[in-house]
């Protein structure tokens, strides 16, 4: 089954309890195919001098793979409780989380490997001054799928590139360790 980050309209319409949120978010972000598809498989980067950089991003053309590297990110109940306590996500209503909270948790879980939770929350709050959660989340999914367009805010575009570069660096580290153990 091919699993990629869901768009807003694909997120659950029903409000979810904490255990359901944990199951759903972890399932979405932990799928190896999702990570390969969204973070690495079609990312544009190559260090060869012959390639021209994209004018908008400065990133070169190329292809990346994960080679079965385990890049799982885990979201726990304690993390969600801390996010609520520190106002990084809204408090659940009658212990139920709504679609915008689930979308924010997916983004936080993916971005937290590169940026601090405070940086992510501050940036999301600033972006929400000029756009809505649905549009911002869909731009994020587009970027992770390498389908961004001219309406995609640069801050989202560069955040996604940072995540992809982080995973490429992790992949290179694993490959280096593997080659050193084999020699």
Would you name each region that the model predicts?
Residues 1-121, 125:
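Basic helix-turn-helix/winged-helix DNA-binding cores
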Residues 123-183:
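Intrinsically disordered, low-complexity, charge-dense segments enriched in Lys/Arg
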